[in-house]
Regions:
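Basic nucleic-acid-binding alpha-helical/helix-turn surface characteristic of O6-alkylguanine DNA
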Residues: 1-112, 162-165
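LysM (lysin motif) carbohydrate-binding repeats in extracellular/periplasmic proteins that recognize
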Residues: 111-114, 155
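Regulatory, non-catalytic segments
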Residues: 115-124
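Short Lys/Arg-enriched helix C-cap and helix-to-coil transition segments
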Residues: 128-135
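…primarily DNA-binding HTH/wHTH and HhH modules…
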Residues: 138-165
């Protein structure tokens, strides 16, 4: 199976996107601490777009303009069963809202698994679309974002700016 790779410019840096014909497998900032390792896990990666990557770019452009609150891009998770449950829960956090890691653990039915939840969030390979940036510390402080706290703050401010009830 071939994987397509495309770099997508955004207001906060280029995103590295990898997809096959069925869904998005990776979307991460090119300067993220995990991007190189994650890219190496895809063999036969070709530098060209496909319909999934074209949709990713289109929807990201709309998102950064405040014209898209929910992505329709099909995603393909790659992780443990627990990680996948954590990432599915992230998809339930609405645009413009945040929850704490503790609240996310409670929603998963594992209230004592706060560190495990935070660790799974840090291994989310599909930034922005799977919105781990919407999870903050219980004291409302910004913590833990593989792309960098400056990017997390930008994304939360962007969503807050365009958030309407």
């Amino acid at each position: 199976m071939n994987f397509c790779l495309k770099y997508i410019p955004t207001p906060i840096g280029r995103l590295c996107a990898v997809a096959d014909e069925e869904g998005l497998l990776m979307l991460d900032f090119e300067d993220s601490k995990y991007v190189e390792k994650d890219l190496n896990s895809f063999k036969n990666c070709i530098h060209e777009s496909n319909s999934i990557l074209d949709l990713v770019e289109k929807e990201l452009n709309l998102y950064f303009k405040g014209k898209l609150k929910k992505f329709s891009v099909p995603v393909k998770f790659s992780g443990t069963e627990f990680q996948q449950r954590v990432w599915e829960e992230l998809l339930k956090i609405p645009f413009g809202e945040t929850i704490s890691y503790q609240e996310q653990a409670q929603r998963l039915g594992s209230p004592k698994a706060v560190r495990a939840v935070a660790s799974a969030n840090s291994r989310n390979k599909i930034s922005i679309i799977i919105p781990c940036h919407r999870v903050i510390g219980k004291d409302k402080k910004l913590t833990g974002y593989a792309g960098g706290l400056d990017k997390k703050e930008f994304l939360l401010n962007l969503e807050n700016t365009f958030y309407k009830d």
